């Protein structure tokens, strides 16, 4: 075992070093090499490391960054898979890079983002102290299948680690059912008030009771199927969260201000990101940090100080034009981005980049469920719409049927002229790419304009 660990770690480090010299990310392939040499190496490398693991459909990267900030503020010796390589190969690579050749950890702590489908495999080997389950939404139907399949993957993974503290979203009727299937200690988090309107017309990925299939009723909805749900037939309902947002003072263009209950006391919390869905990321991170032993004061400071993950409300200077990039990958997340954009009340240029590679989901039918009509409703504030990516023509057609003025839509089949157009914009630029489009465009932006690589 020791010999296999040695060679697994050695080859992983060599592969990572070579790929970085070639200016490649090297975030997952080195882990695949290590797992080929020793399939159980992750379990060996993670011994003695105190881990917070974040999984779920939306919010993994941003929540992980919020948690990281608290670790950094406390001066803890930690690492994280901040590149977004969240399958078992990427996670294994990160542990190997922070281990000695004999497999001894160099860091005592880790913040790990884990793909929801991969959690059933990762958690066979990794035993986190805290697991955060953010939410479950319809996402990449070609890969994940039905929404309950995603939920079952998470449950199956958690069954391998019964001592981990579960921090679950009380407002997600799917995630809230997890304690029925596992014996783990549970901390619930949620939002006790509507967020920027109670839009009951918004599409719901889980409108019916997970137990008896009766349609839920809501005391209020926050977004998607999240909110104060209850089943009028069998009685399944949202349970009161221990960590909760109890009031919203401000949903600004760049930040938010809320009142949050942590440990039975209320705190004024400034969140260093805008949009309703980031309030969920903040309260989920607060629950995880509280369960891990951080004080409320440390949590509040971290939520106001953290920097966003790449492509998640990330700001760019486009040669003097302000730009912001917001990853979109499914109807629920896209709708929240649209809600944020529709509330800006300023002239802007919008960019939508649609790819259909494996990491994006090859089935792009989700764009017809996303509420792009909100863009059309912006009227004269919608100055330009630039469309790009492998499926740019499909996106142009979707925007046409959403009611966007065709005269305002311009298609770019290459990123270099798109970047030139963004930099020449007289208005702030808001970029909405799918995952691989984000990596492609961000890489091209980095080469032209400078900035950090995506793994930094």
Regions found by a protein language model. Give the residues of each.
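Adenine nucleotide phosphate-binding catalytic loops in nucleotide-utilizing enzymes
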Residues: 187-331
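Phosphate-binding loop of NTP-binding sites
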Residues: 3-190, 196-208
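Residue-level signal for inorganic ion chemistry
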Residues: 113, 134, 167, 281, ...
């Amino acid at each position: 075992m020791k010999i296999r660990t040695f060679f697994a770690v050695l080859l992983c480090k060599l592969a990572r070093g070579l790929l970085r010299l070639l200016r490649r990310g090297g975030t997952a392939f080195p882990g695949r090499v290590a797992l080929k040499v020793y399939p159980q190496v992750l379990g060996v490398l993670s011994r003695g490391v105190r881990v917070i693991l974040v999984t779920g459909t939306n919010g993994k990267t941003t929540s992980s960054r919020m948690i990281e900030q608290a670790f950094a503020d406390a001066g803890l010796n930690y690492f994280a898979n901040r590149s977004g390589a969240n399958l078992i190969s990427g996670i294994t690579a990160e542990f190997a890079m922070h281990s000695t050749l004999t497999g001894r950890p160099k860091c005592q702590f880790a913040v790990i983002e884990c793909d929801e489908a991969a959690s059933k495999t990762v958690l066979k080997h990794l035993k986190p102290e805290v697991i955060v389950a953010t939410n479950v939404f319809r996402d990449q139907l070609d890969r994940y299948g039905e929404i309950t399949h995603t939920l079952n993957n998470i449950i199956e993974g958690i069954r391998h680690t019964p001592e981990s503290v579960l921090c679950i979203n009380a407002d997600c009727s799917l995630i809230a059912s997890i304690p029925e299937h596992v014996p783990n200690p549970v901390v619930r988090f949620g939002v006790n008030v509507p967020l920027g309107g109670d839009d009951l017309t918004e599409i719901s990925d889980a409108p019916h009771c997970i137990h008896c299939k009766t349609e839920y009723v809501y005391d209020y909805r926050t977004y998607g199927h999240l909110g104060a749900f209850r089943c009028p037939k069998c009685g399944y309902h949202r349970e009161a969260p221990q960590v909760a947002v109890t009031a919203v003072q401000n949903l600004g263009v760049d930040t938010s201000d809320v009142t949050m209950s942590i440990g039975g006391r209320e705190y004024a919390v400034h969140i260093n990101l805008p949009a309703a869905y980031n309030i969920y990321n903040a309260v989920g991170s607060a629950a995880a940090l509280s369960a891990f032993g951080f004080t409320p004061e440390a949590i509040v400071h971290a939520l106001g100080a953290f920097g966003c993950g790449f492509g998640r409300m990330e700001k760019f200077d486009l040669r003097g034009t302000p730009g912001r990039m917001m990853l979109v990958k499914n109807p629920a997340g896209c709708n929240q981005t649209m809600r944020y954009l529709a509330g800006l009340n300023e002239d802007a240029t919008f960019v939508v980049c649609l790819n259909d590679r494996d990491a994006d989901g090859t089935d792009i039918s989700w764009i017809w469920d996303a509420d792009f009509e909100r863009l059309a409703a912006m009227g004269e504030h919608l100055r330009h719409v630039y469309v790009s990516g492998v499926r740019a023509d499909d996106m142009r057609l979707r925007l046409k049927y959403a009611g966007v003025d065709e005269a305002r839509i311009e298609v770019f089949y290459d990123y270099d002229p798109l970047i030139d157009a963004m930099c020449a914009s007289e208005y702030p630029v808001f970029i909405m790419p799918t995952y691989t489009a984000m990596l492609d465009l961000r890489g091209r932006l980095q080469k032209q304009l400078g900035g950090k690589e995506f793994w930094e």
